[in-house]
Amino acid sequence: MLREIRPAIVLLLVLTAITGLAYPLAMTGIAGMLFPAQAQGSLIEKDGKVIGSALIGQEFKDDKYFHGRPSATLAPDPNDSTKTVSAPYNAANSGGSNLGPTSKALADRLKEDVDKLKAENPNAAVPVDLVTTSASGLDPDISPEAAQFQVPRVAKARNMPEEAVKQLVASNVQGRLLGLLGEPRVNVLALNLALDRAAAK
């Protein structure tokens, strides 16, 4: 009997060593050599300290910063382990709200968010990505239109000329991947850091 199952056991051990050890180590090593920043998580530093990643969004509430998309991520309720509480951009619990198009809760939240944004900039149409969550809840980017929509608020909060803030947005727009894939986008953290640098001059 052992003679019959020995080839299967040997094959299992060989494939486990190849796919579970050799391949992952090789890919990690190659990625580290060819794309060191990306292999480490595309981390962003300020004054020698890691403050975030270009791949994971953060919540900005202050009027002097650009805001990202709404996030529906949750965290355990510290007062009741059977419940959850809202925890925007919680990378430990990535996910969407799972609210469907007929959901009253979703419709009410959208209306509230749209009304708030229209009060902030009544002369412009509200970009859809400023009121809709992404599937992961961690989207680090917004559309150029969503960034331009926020220019008046940010410029006023920082006492900067709107044109200067618009130029900052324009200089932080990333194009389509390979000129074909995806849509133009603005990384919110990178834009806010550029804004801080410009304001410090």
Curated annotation (Swiss-Prot):
Entry GO CC: plasma membrane
Superkingdom of the organism of origin: Bacteria
Transmembrane segments: 7-27
Membrane topology classification: Single-pass membrane protein
Molecular-function GO terms, alphabetical: ATP binding; P-type potassium transmembrane transporter activity
One record GO biological process: potassium ion transmembrane transport
Oligomeric form and interacting partners: The system is composed of three essential subunits: KdpA, KdpB and KdpC.
Protein name, per record: Potassium-transporting ATPase KdpC subunit
Organism: Bradyrhizobium diazoefficiens (strain JCM 10833 / BCRC 13528 / IAM 13628 / NBRC 14792 / USDA 110)
